Curated annotation (Swiss-Prot):
It comes from Debaryomyces hansenii (strain ATCC 36239 / CBS 767 / BCRC 21394 / JCM 1990 / NBRC 0083 / IGC 2968) (Yeast). This is Ribosome biogenesis protein RLP7. InterPro entries: Ribo_uL30_ferredoxin-like_sf, Ribosomal_uL30, Ribosomal_uL30_CS, Ribosomal_uL30_euk_arc, Ribosomal_uL30_ferredoxin-like. The gene is RLP7. SUPFAM superfamilies: Ribosomal protein L30p/L7e (SSF55129). Keywords: Nucleus, Ribosome biogenesis, RNA-binding.
């Protein structure tokens, strides 16, 4: 059994090191904020052509019209939704939702859609979360349909995501601040859910999500959004050309109708390409 060193000099040195690390991290965070503010100031002073302003205005106008149509349609069919609520558990299915870059450059996401994206923790492109699809969640997903792709993942895809991308937030023992760490230890799962949920390994979490178990929400909220690779990366001329070609090939038609359906894709292939 290891004996803890109780030498006052060593304890004082450790305490000073922890204080120094904490101050260094605070200074680094302050520098990042200053750099971000400087970039934002430069971006705000950037010259914008009149044609760009008109294009952005029309795009935002169409997007707001789409949100308005969906909201109106959902209000009118609210009575049907109440009767369907009893069938939620029977008709529910698992979806994996990935946030994609905005379909139109310069588009400002409407507040209702932005709130749904924030609720799902999809604040950045190329991040994904598991969602339990029910009649109650369909209207919310329709609001954000231009900003996401969705589909039913296979058990193999879920396992691949956990093996390569699963991360959680933990409290650092030294700095007492939250930090992100990879979920690759069954002991962490057992310490977190062993007594309450009976989950003692990562495979138990995968089973809970895949089968839409009783503790689906607790497990999915504990795991941070999965960060996927961008389909095309880089900043050089070839990368810009590749991004343009990818954008043209994957251009999506967006319906303004209030009763537009939520389109689902082969999410397994999408995960394989960006995992």
């Amino acid at each position: 059994m290891a004996v803890l060193n109780s030498n006052p000099e060593i304890l004082l040195r450790k305490r000073k090191n922890n204080d120094r690390k904490r101050l260094e991290k605070q200074e680094q965070a302050r520098q990042r904020q200053l750099e971000q503010k400087k970039k934002n100031d430069q971006r705000s002073k950037k010259f914008v052509r009149a044609e760009t302003l008109v294009s952005n205005y029309k795009s935002n106008e169409l997007e707001n019209k789409r949100i308005k149509h969906i909201t109106k349609f959902e209000k009118q069919s609210q009575a049907d939704k109440i009767s369907q609520a009893k069938e939620d558990d029977e008709s529910a299915k698992l979806l994996f939702i990935i946030r994609i870059p905005d379909h139109t450059k310069g588009l400002k996401v409407p507040s209702k859609a932005r709130k749904v994206l924030h609720l799902l923790r999809l604040n950045r492109p190329n991040t994904g979360v598991f969602v339990k699809l029910t009649p109650a969640t369909v209207p919310l997903l329709k609001l954000i349909s231009p900003y996401i792709v969705a589909g039913k993942p296979s058990l193999n895809s879920i396992r691949k995501l956990f093996q390569k991308r699963a991360c959680i937030s933990v409290i650092d023992e030294e700095t007492k601040e939250p930090r992100i760490t990879k979920l690759d230890n069954n002991g962490v799962v057992e310490d977190k859910f062993g007594d309450d949920l009976g989950c003692i390994c990562i495979e138990d979490l995968i089973h809970e999500l895949a089968t839409l178990g009783e503790h689906f929400k607790t497990v999915s909220n504990w795991i941070l959004p999965f960060k996927l690779n961008a389909p095309v990366s880089g900043w050089g001329p070839q990368a810009k050309l590749a991004k343009l070609q990818y954008s043209n090939e994957h251009q999506r038609k967006i319906s303004l109708a209030g009763d537009a359906k939520l389109n689902e894709i082969d999410i397994d292939q999408f995960i394989d390409e960006q995992n």
